[in-house]
């Protein structure tokens, strides 16, 4: 597509909002909580100092140190932040066409950003030569017939004369909580006044891009908006400046609806699905990366932000502690690896969310799955629904080997209902479940393997979702009372293996009150043991051995919420 084509920026923005609406979340409470923390905890003398630094025409390493130190203080005060999580997208996360499309756009974006940053310097030297060396260099170039490029730049050209330009990365994006706190403090208004004013800008943003004329009209109603600068926002100066774009972004976070892109939250579980959805919207709307230097269009802006970090709030969270750029932190691996069974991505619209394991983790899982003998009876059971499983168990009674893994649910409402009446698992215990592990295990099941289960419908749907239609499912179809005949001895002997079922079970009301109802939670592994015991007429006699190490089941950084 020609880069000269006019870009319908707001139409693209609206299309992205609609298409990515399922990933947006209400953030007003979180933003205001962080704003209050910043307002109460930040030294605003240092804020004023940094704002003066940002107004200087030339800034050095000492100035950058002050900016970075203040950014770190802000980051420490905030709960909404992006984490350093480098991501390698592979076949299975996206299809080959999508991976190639993403790789191409990231490369174009890299060139565009590089050219924009170079042109923004206005031809002014950004390195660390001394002034005398620069003068001598200019004289030498003039003698050799090179004419100095005449650069037209609106206003003052502000540059960073620093030894390591990489230290500038991720230090300048506006953060709504910081914008609200600074406006409250420095405009001498209440936070309530600031919130009302920014909300008006946010509401306007749902139908158009607010401009300076709109700002002037709104300022007549909201005095605190006088602090918003009328100057065009420049590159690498917006962190603590009251630009219109920073105010609009803050306003977007204060709305209860609107599917604002600013409220997207990325997790390791939904990252690949967000990328997939974005590429689909791009194709439908004819979006593209325009490599000409200049401001990013809505698609470019979204792509840059979501690829910078695989976890957090890409638009509005603190990201000053992230190292690297988008094309460095999100990379594409087009190589294919032989697998024990076919592993294909989920179908559009389904809730299975594939994520990524490290090379070492994949190696450990492959080694464990290599001990599953496809010629032996293999029980399989899950907790949760087929399109949103939270626990998977495989059990081979002949050897005692078992696989047990977990997954954070996508449908929290459905999960809580299942927790209350069935499995008793708690959301807080699954927050740090290793992303992608459950799906990877299913993908590694040997080709054409036979799996034994009590009730086959959900298992059939689960393996089909993962592209494993080759797997054979045998349903033993025991009566409910017969299937749970050994429930008490199984829980007595093996309950210590069931560590994530700590909720209280409330039995559902049934028409037949003569049938006793169990108050024990359903555990995928223990259910497999019960079903096998019902067939064998006795509890397992072979010592059980878990094939996956506990350290692999959950990530090291446990989830923490306030």
UniProtKB/Swiss-Prot annotation:
Example GO molecular function term?
Answer: metal ion binding
Annotated region Binding site for the cap structure m7GTP: the residues are: 54-237
What are its E.C. numbers? 3.1.13.-
Q: Which residues bind Zn(2+)?
A: 391, 498, 501, 523
The positions annotated for binding Mn(2+) are 381, 383, 527
Alphabetically sorted, this entry's keywords are: Capsid protein, Helical capsid protein, Host cytoplasm, Host-virus interaction, Hydrolase, Inhibition of host IKBKE by virus, Inhibition of host innate immune response by virus, Inhibition of host RLR pathway by virus, Interferon antiviral system evasion, Manganese, Metal-binding, Ribonucleoprotein, RNA-binding, Viral immunoevasion, Viral nucleoprotein, Virion, Zinc
This protein's GO CC annotations: helical viral capsid; host cell cytoplasm; ribonucleoprotein complex; viral nucleocapsid
What does this protein's UniProt record list under function?
Encapsidates the genome, protecting it from nucleases. The encapsidated genomic RNA is termed the nucleocapsid (NC). Serves as template for viral transcription and replication. The increased presence of protein N in host cell does not seem to trigger the switch from transcription to replication as observed in other negative strain RNA viruses.
Domain comment?
The N-terminal region is important for the cap-binding activity while the C-terminal region contains the 3'-5' exoribonuclease activity. A CCHE zinc binding site is present in the C-terminal region and may thus contribute to the substrate binding and/or the specificity of the exonuclease activity.
Q: What is this protein called?
A: Nucleoprotein
Q: What is the lineage of its organism?
A: Viruses, Riboviria, Orthornavirae, Negarnaviricota, Polyploviricotina
**Recorded name of the encoding gene:** N
């Amino acid at each position: 597509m020609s880069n000269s084509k006019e870009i319908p920026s707001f139409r693209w923005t609206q299309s992205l909002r609609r298409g990515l609406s399922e990933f947006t979340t209400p953030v007003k409470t979180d933003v205001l909580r962080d704003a209050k923390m910043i307002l109460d905890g930040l030294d605003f003398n240092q804020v004023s100092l940094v704002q003066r630094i940002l107004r200087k025409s030339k800034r050095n390493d000492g100035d950058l140190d002050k900016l970075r130190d203040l950014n770190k203080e802000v980051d420490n005060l905030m709960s909404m932040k992006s984490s350093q999580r480098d991501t390698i997208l592979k076949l299975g996360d996206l299809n080959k066409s999508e991976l190639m499309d993403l790789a191409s756009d990231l490369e174009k974006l890299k060139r565009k950003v590089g050219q924009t940053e170079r042109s923004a310097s206005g031809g002014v030297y950004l390195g660390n030569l001394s002034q005398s060396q620069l003068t001598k260099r200019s004289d030498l170039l003039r003698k050799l017939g090179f004419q100095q490029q005449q650069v037209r730049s609106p206003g003052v050209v502000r540059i960073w004369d620093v030894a390591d330009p990489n230290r500038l990365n991720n230090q300048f994006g506006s953060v709504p909580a910081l914008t609200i706190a600074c406006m409250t403090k420095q405009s001498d208004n209440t936070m309530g006044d600031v919130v009302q004013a920014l909300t008006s800008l946010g509401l306007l943003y749902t139908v158009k891009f607010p401009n300076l004329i709109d700002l002037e009209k709104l300022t007549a109603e909201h005095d605190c908006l006088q602090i918003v600068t009328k100057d065009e926002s420049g590159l690498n100066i917006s962190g603590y400046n009251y630009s219109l774009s920073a105010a609009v972004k803050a306003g977007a976070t204060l709305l209860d609806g609107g599917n604002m892109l600013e409220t997207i939250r990325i997790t390791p579980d939904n990252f690949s699905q967000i990328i997939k959805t974005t590429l689909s919207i791009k194709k439908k709307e004819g979006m593209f990366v325009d490599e000409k230097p200049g401001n990013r269009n809505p698609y470019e802006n979204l792509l840059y932000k979501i690829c910078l970090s695989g976890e957090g709030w890409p638009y509005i969270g603190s990201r000053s502690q992230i190292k690297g750029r988008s094309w460095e932190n999100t990379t594409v691996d087009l190589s294919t690896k032989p697998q024990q069974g076919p592993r294909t991505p989920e179908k559009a619209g389904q809730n299975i969310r594939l994520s990524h394991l490290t090379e070492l983790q994949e190696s450990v899982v492959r080694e464990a799955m290599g001990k599953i003998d496809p010629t032996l009876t293999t029980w399989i059971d899950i907790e949760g629904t087929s399109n949103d499983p939270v626990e998977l168990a495989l059990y081979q009674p002949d050897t005692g080997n078992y696989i047990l893994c977990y997954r954070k649910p996508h449908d929290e409402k459905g999960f809580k209902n299942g927790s209350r009446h069935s499995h008793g698992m708690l959301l807080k215990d699954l927050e740090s479940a290793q992303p992608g592990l459950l799906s990877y295990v299913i993908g590694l099941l040997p080709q054409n393997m036979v799996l034994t289960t009590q009730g086959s419908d959900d298992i059939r749907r689960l393996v089909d979702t993962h592209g494993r239609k080759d797997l054979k499912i045998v349903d033993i179809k025991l009566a409910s009372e017969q299937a749970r005949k050994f429930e008490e001895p199984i829980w007595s002997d093996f309950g210590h293996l069931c560590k994530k079922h700590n909720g209280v079970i409330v039995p559902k009301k049934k028409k037949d009150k003569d049938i006793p109802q169990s108050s024990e939670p359903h555990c995928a592994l223990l259910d497999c043991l019960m079903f096998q015991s019902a067939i064998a007429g006795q509890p397992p006699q072979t010592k059980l051995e878990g094939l996956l190490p506990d350290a692999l089941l959950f990530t090291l950084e446990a989830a923490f919420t306030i």
